[in-house]
Each structure stands twice: as structure tokens, then as C-alpha cells.
From Swiss-Prot:
Gene: NDUFV2
Domain of life: Eukaryota
Subcellular location: Mitochondrion inner membrane
Reaction equation(s) it catalyzes: a ubiquinone + NADH + 5 H(+)(in) = a ubiquinol + NAD(+) + 4 H(+)(out)
Protein known as: NADH dehydrogenase [ubiquinone] flavoprotein 2
The UniProt record lists the keyword Lyase: no
Cofactor: [2Fe-2S] cluster
Cofactor note: Binds 1 [2Fe-2S] cluster.
């Protein structure tokens, strides 16, 4: 969803 990739990298 909205910038999901960015959140995933925040791990």
C-alpha cells in the first residue's frame, strides 16, 4: 500500500 516498501525496510 502507501509506500509499503519504505515501511518494510524500517524493519
Amino acid at each position: 500500500g502507501a509506500g509499503g516498501a519504505l515501511f518494510v525496510h524500517r524493519d
